[in-house]
Amino acid sequence: MSKLQGTGKTRLAMALVAVVVILAVGVYLNSMQKPSESRQAKTSDADAANPNTPEKNPAKSADGNIELVASYKADVSGNNAWCAPLQICWDQMRNTTNAGQALEPTADAPTEGRSLADALNAGTFETTRLSDALWYSYAGPMNAEARRQIEEAIAQKFNQKSDILDKLNWQSANENMLLFYAMLYHTFSFEHPFALSPEKGGFGEDPEANVSYFGTEDAPDDQRRDLLAQVTPLYYSSSDDCACTVKTKEGDLLVLVKKPKGSSFSEIWTNAMAAAQTGDHRPLSNKEDFSCPKLDVDILTTYRALEGLTFDVTDGRKLKIAQAMQTLKMTLDNEGGSVKSEAAITAELTSLDPQGLRTFRFDDSFALFLVDGKATGNVTGDGSLSSDAQPYLALLVNDAKLWQTD
């Protein structure tokens, strides 16, 4: 762990919002409906999330705010968001400290922390589904050099500054403290900007929700064909059970699912993709419409349930999480959108207990065998001893002085 590691591997770009950020928002596909009839849903109160106070989790769905969940497989309800950086950090921590194996909390771990760790262990994120241009990560010692490396990397790659590094406890970092950091940043645009609705509308069961929309309903007739061509239906059972994609200029796909089914984003995605297999993919006609709420969220979440968790990792060491947090800034409007998310996990990796260290000191009776490593069947492919090996020399030593001439 003496070497700093900044990573960001060249990968295939996939559907940005579908894979990286998923928000439970509504999409309206309808045939000649009035705006007031098609715009119904539950508002996401982004303003209630406090992005500046890591002392508490500002995102509690039950309180009407937006909850930034830690794992793609975590339970969701109400208003939730998920983005990949925290999972990337967790996966790096597994790979660095526990040979890629699941991080299992010790027996005294609180139930909430254990549940969150289980969800992160189950939610491994495939960075092969992200292009290199979208993300950066670091795994290594937590020190001034690490901070300098991260700040220079994200400035060069994204022209961005960190919103999270100042919130980490650098003063208490010692030689055993590790930092796992990731940033995802991307902007996308629609080749043909959608029309902004001149009036705000309802959402869900609240006709007075005062929600801003964009789409095709208020677009001039000569622009509708190009706007509708950006929208591809995935399935349509009714105006309350439908899904579509919206293509961006950069090739990303915005995936929108109305009345999503499932208890986690993972289940919602799986169910939507299953429905899309047999769905109605006919292009929208000039008499059909699309509309979507504008989105603007800025969230900082500190995962207190993870902090203090201790894990038994490889080589008899222990790993204890000190801090775990994530940010999400996302916008979506008629012209396109942006996503910026950072996550960091700091953890102390303790050395072996001296009493638990193994000592191979042959200072009493011992046997010695010599095996030809080049002969067939004596060693395995990685050079280790085969169970079928045949030694060509064997010694049994009970008095080492007899075996020495000086």
Task: Give the predicted meaning of each segment.
Residues 15-26:
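Hydrophobic membrane-insertion alpha-helices, especially the h-region
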Residues 8-11, 44, 54:
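N-terminal compositionally biased, intrinsically disordered segments and leader/signal-like regions
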Residues 1-2, 62:
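Initiator methionine at the very start of the polypeptide chain
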Residues 5-17:
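N-terminal Sec-pathway targeting helices
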Residues 50-406:
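Hydrophobic-core positions in well-structured secondary-structure elements of globular domains
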Residues 25-33:
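Juxtamembrane cytosolic interface motif at the C-terminal end of transmembrane helices
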Residues 32-50:
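Ser/Thr/Pro/Gly-rich low-complexity linker/stalk segments immediately outside membranes or between
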